[in-house]
Amino acid sequence: MKVIVTKSYDETCTVIANLFRDLIVAKPNAKLGLATGGTPVPIYKKLIAMNEAGTLDFSGVHTVNLDEYCGIDGTHDQSYRYFMNTNLFDHINIDKNNTFVAKGLGDFEANARELEAKVYEGGVADIQLLGIGNNGHIAFN
């Protein structure tokens, strides 16, 4: 593990966005583990700006998100699929068929198996973005 100390949240977001950029440039078919919530939004904005500037190409990238709310469809404004579309996917040149957010409706056990398969399909994520909450939680747990 590498620990990087920064002076501000904005600097932290810039460092993280640059880590993602460097990975994608080096490995255009990178697999990204992504997160939802407030923490990653500024990072996503920086990645969008890089894509819009033509310095970052998401066309070969694959993504996996690790959670979704049960009982709501991906078009619901509280779903994580909706969050990812609104905050990142709709603004970059990624093939949405290469993005995975677990289903919130249907057979939850089958959905969990599908999520597990996607996590390991083609190897684990090359990089994983997770938030740390003010109460110490990591990711959504």
Model-derived features: positions:
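Ligand-binding beta-strand-loop-alpha-helix segment within the catalytic cores
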Residues: 56-128
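Redox-cofactor binding/interface segments in oxidoreductases and associated redox assembly factors
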Residues: 34, 128-130
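Electropositive phosphate-/nucleotide-binding environments in soluble metabolic enzymes
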Residues: 6, 10, 14, 41, ...
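N-terminal glycine-/serine-/threonine-rich phosphate-binding loop
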Residues: 1-32
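Generic structural signal for well-ordered alpha-helical scaffold segments
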Residues: 17-25, 48, 52, 85-89, ...
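Glycine-rich N-terminal segment of FAD-binding domains in flavoprotein oxidoreductases
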Residues: 26-51
